[in-house]
């Protein structure tokens, strides 16, 4: 919105700010780019850790990366079957 008003008033954004914004967009894109293998490994690691505390439906577990203009978010949908009363490490 401010950028629109600045343009209407004839003020151009400083080249420093334009370069900074472009770099930010490149970094966000890089962070969101993840190989299917790495995403699968992340999913397996989440299952290992969470399974120490609760019984989960591994088949219905969903892990995704979402990005908007400013950030990348890890979204995990993990159906819980039941909580474990005692902590136990499998393996």
UniProtKB/Swiss-Prot annotation:
Gene3D superfamilies in the record: Cell division topological specificity factor MinE (3.30.1070.10)
Higher taxonomy: Bacteria, Bacillati, Bacillota, Clostridia, Eubacteriales
GO biological process, one term: cell division
Transmembrane segments: none
Organism of origin: Desulfitobacterium hafniense (strain Y51)
Keyword Cell division (UniProt): yes
Pfam family, one: MinE
Family: Belongs to the MinE family.
Protein name according to UniProt: Cell division topological specificity factor
Functional description taken from the UniProt entry: Prevents the cell division inhibition by proteins MinC and MinD at internal division sites while permitting inhibition at polar sites. This ensures cell division at the proper site by restricting the formation of a division septum at the midpoint of the long axis of the cell.
Taxonomic superkingdom: Bacteria
Record key words, sorted: Cell cycle, Cell division
């Amino acid at each position: 919105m401010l950028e629109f008003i600045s343009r209407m008033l004839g003020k151009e954004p400083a080249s420093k700010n334009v370069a900074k914004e472009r770099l930010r967009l490149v970094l966000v894109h890089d962070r969101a780019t993840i190989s299917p293998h790495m995403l699968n490994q992340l999913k397996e690691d989440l299952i290992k850790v969470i399974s120490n505390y609760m019984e989960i439906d591994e088949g219905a577990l969903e892990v995704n990366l979402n990005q908007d203009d400013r950030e990348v978010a890890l979204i995990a949908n993990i159906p819980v079957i039941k909580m474990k009363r005692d902590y136990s490490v499998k393996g």
